[in-house]
Regions:
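A domain-start/cap signature at the N-terminus of enzymes
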Residues: 1-31, 75, 220, 272, ...
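Short coil turns that delineate tetratricopeptide repeat
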Residues: 117, 248-251, 374, 408
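Short beta-strand/loop motif that positions the catalytic acidic residue
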Residues: 145-148
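Structural register within alpha-helical repeat arrays
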Residues: 223, 243, 260, 348-349, ...
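Residue at a conserved register position within TPR or TPR-like alpha-solenoid repeats
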Residues: 227, 352-353, 387
Length: 439
């Protein structure tokens, strides 16, 4: 009934995971298990997120503290260690093994199903879908619940994946939430677990439970009707569509199918679908334009200044639109584009560093990321590390100071970072470390 944030595996004490066992847990029966993958290796974050739903439905939740964005082999080894250890110590229902992840963790969850020869009953993918190395193909053997924030730069990818799952005849559902590139909120996380329970009933992985099915059906039908009555036609259309798909074969879904068809033919829904597609196109064009300008900034000397000015102009315009109070398509496109460009250059810098690229290349990528996301403490910390590796103490200390001002407070990370060794004797470095320790 409590989250244990670090459990060391029996075979390797360096491999740890966060763990939640429901209060009703007993080794005398087999339990569904949800394996979680956070892109920063914060196993407790998703375990806490899914804890309430796990308690309600009787699931074990496990989150790796070692798996993270970066080298795939290391993350897969972390997953293997976690799988083997929990299989040895916890009574797991092998037919009901699930995985969830956010961003790169979502891609890893789907990759694991491929590598374990389809051992997963379901995947809850937040903020990203399939790995870039392969595409979905029939039959999709696991149930897929996709989620993305309306401001997430990967929102178009998740919508496209949902459509692809439909074409492949897969068991799937997609839900959006207010927010950006992040884990879903607790309510949606609970809805995903509830949906997996419903799919388990449909697939014969758990006993038929008419009371459970009736309860979920009644609540979701009322929600869909409420959306339609409130003239939220597109949300109602999506709600009736998923309701019909989820309960087909369990209940009479003719009302849901009828309302979905009627709403789908309405001007409001057609306009919403058209606007959604246009948002995707605008994001793609803007991101491509910014990538091209960023490349030109490193090109011929004569064109650098103009490219830099054009880049700044577009970014400043997007930033202004991103601050708008109203949730409009224009605001969503601005936020998604800024997020996409930031992530692109931040991840490029991380890859360059892992490949032991020349420090100036890492600095260049992070400078672009910091220009697009000037309020990110993590980016300025990474920029400080890159400047130090490039033997530039002055710029490194300036970036560290900015990171601290923005809220960076992981003094231990500074002290453990080898690239910052040349700064250890600097008075300002010591002052920044002490300030971080008291934050």
């Amino acid at each position: 009934g409590v989250v244990v944030e670090s459990v060391a595996t029996l075979r390797d004490a360096g491999q740890t995971y966060a763990l939640y066992l429901p209060t009703s847990y007993t080794p005398s029966k087999r339990w569904p298990v949800l394996y979680c993958f956070d892109p920063l290796g914060r196993g407790a974050v998703p375990v806490k997120l899914y804890g309430e739903a796990a308690e309600r439905f009787g699931w074990v939740v496990v989150g790796s503290n070692n798996s993270r964005n970066g080298p795939v082999a290391a993350s897969l080894e972390a997953a293997r260690a976690m799988f083997e250890d929990t299989a040895a110590r916890i009574s797991v229902d092998a037919r009901r093994v699930y995985a969830t992840g956010f961003s790169g963790g979502a891609r890893q969850s789907i990759l694991i199903d491929r590598l374990c020869r389809h051992c997963l009953a379901g995947v809850i993918a937040a903020g990203a879908g399939y790995p870039t190395t392969f595409r979905p193909s029939a039959p999709v053997t696991f149930a897929l619940f996709g989620a993305a924030g309306t401001d997430d730069f990967n929102f178009p990818e998740m919508k496209a994946l949902d459509a692809e799952m439909s074409r492949l005849g897969a068991t799937h559902r997609f839900e959006s939430f207010d927010g950006g590139h992040a884990w879903p909120p607790p309510g949606l996380a609970a809805a995903a677990v509830e949906w997996m329970e419903l799919q388990a009933v449909r697939a014969g992985l758990r006993p038929k439970d008419e009371a459970f099915a009736a309860r979920v059906w009644g609540r979701r039908l009322a929600e869909a009707r409420g959306l339609e009555e409130a003239s939220n036609s597109y949300a109602a259309y999506r709600a009736f569509e998923s309701l019909a798909a989820d309960f087909r074969g369990l209940r009479d879904v003719s009302e849901a199918e009828g309302r979905c068809a009627a709403l789908g033919a309405s001007k409001e829904v057609k306009a919403a679908l058209r606007d959604e597609a246009e948002q995707t196109g605008r994001q793609s064009r803007l991101a491509a334009q910014l990538f091209e300008l960023a490349e030109r900034r490193r090109g011929e000397f004569e064109s650098r200044a103009q490219a830099a000015a054009d880049f700044r102009g577009i970014v400043e315009g997007l930033r202004a639109k991103a601050k708008a109070e109203a949730d409009t398509g224009e605001r969503r496109v601005a936020r998604r584009t800024l997020g996409q460009v930031t992530a692109h250059f931040y991840e490029a810098a991380a890859n360059l560093r892992r490949q032991h690229a020349r420090p100036p290349e890492v600095v260049a990528a992070l400078e672009v990321a910091s220009e697009v996301a000037p309020h990110s403490p993590q980016i300025f910390y990474e920029l400080a590390v890159a400047h130090a590796a490039n033997s530039d103490k002055r710029r490194s200390l300036a970036a560290l100071r900015k990171a601290s001002e923005l809220g960076f407070k992981d003094a231990d990370a500074l002290e453990k970072e080898p690239a910052l060794e040349p700064l250890r004797g600097e008075a300002e470095y010591r002052r920044l470390v002490e300030e971080m320790r008291v934050k």
